[in-house]
Amino acid sequence: MVKVKFCGIASLEDAILAEKLGADFIGFVTDTASPRFVKKDFIGFVRRYVEIPTVEVIVKGNVSESIDKTKADLIQIHRVLTRRELDEIHMYRKKVILYVPSSDMYQEYFRSVISMGFNVLVDSEIKGSKVNLDLARGWAKEYEIGIGGGISPDNLHDFLSINPKWIDVSSGIEKYKGKKDPSKMLKIIEGVRKWKYTQ
């Protein structure tokens, strides 16, 4: 079954609800520019109340340092890395999720990070733009990938149709930035479960 990551969690209440509804893991954004920003210590606090894996999402900063200092089970780096950075964190590959833009110009980068054994999240190249689902579908046929980029209850089936290993949902399950909508969260979980039984 496709796994579900609810990202942009900014309250203990939403974290507990995500686990209760059936999310497989939850994400926390520690980039200060984000409206969903939380401090690293908050992740450690939440981990005392939930059992599902936690993911820290970073955009800037030294990647090795960020991995060493994270309070989460996994760390997601939401930028394209240099070859030097990839080599630097290769030993942590099972703990790291790398963002790959859904664009033809990143085909070589995609194959590099896959060949190195990293977990991959395919997302839109530019924030707010649509994901290239045709490209992602081709990648998903060959490799196990995660997919994100504006997933909501209304377009969930479009993303599930590429057969990803997992989906990353954030703004599509919000009442407003930083606050989740329980009904939308439930619709995503139910949609994924129904999809499993129709395949």
Swiss-Prot record:
Note the InterPro entries from the entry. Answer: Aldolase_TIM, PRAI_dom, RibuloseP-bd_barrel, TrpF_fam
E.C. number, please? 5.3.1.24
Picking any one GO molecular function of the record gives: phosphoribosylanthranilate isomerase activity
Does the record carry Isomerase as a key word? yes
Q: Print the keywords alphabetically.
A: Amino-acid biosynthesis, Aromatic amino acid biosynthesis, Isomerase, Tryptophan biosynthesis
Q: In which pathway does it act?
A: Amino-acid biosynthesis; L-tryptophan biosynthesis; L-tryptophan from chorismate: step 3/5
Query: Which SUPFAM superfamilies does the record associate with it?
Result: Ribulose-phoshate binding barrel
Q: Which reaction does it catalyse?
A: N-(5-phospho-beta-D-ribosyl)anthranilate = 1-(2-carboxyphenylamino)-1-deoxy-D-ribulose 5-phosphate
Could you tell me which Pfam families the record lists for this protein? PRAI
Q: Has keyword Isomerase? A: yes
Superkingdom as given in the UniProt entry: Archaea
EC class, as a word, reads isomerase
Its GO biological process terms? L-tryptophan biosynthetic process
HAMAP family in the cross-refs: PRAI
* Annotated PANTHER family: N-(5'-PHOSPHORIBOSYL)ANTHRANILATE ISOMERASE
Concerning its family, UniProt says: Belongs to the TrpF family.
Name of this chain's protein: N-(5'-phosphoribosyl)anthranilate isomerase
What is the originating organism of this protein? Sulfolobus acidocaldarius (strain ATCC 33909 / DSM 639 / JCM 8929 / NBRC 15157 / NCIMB 11770)
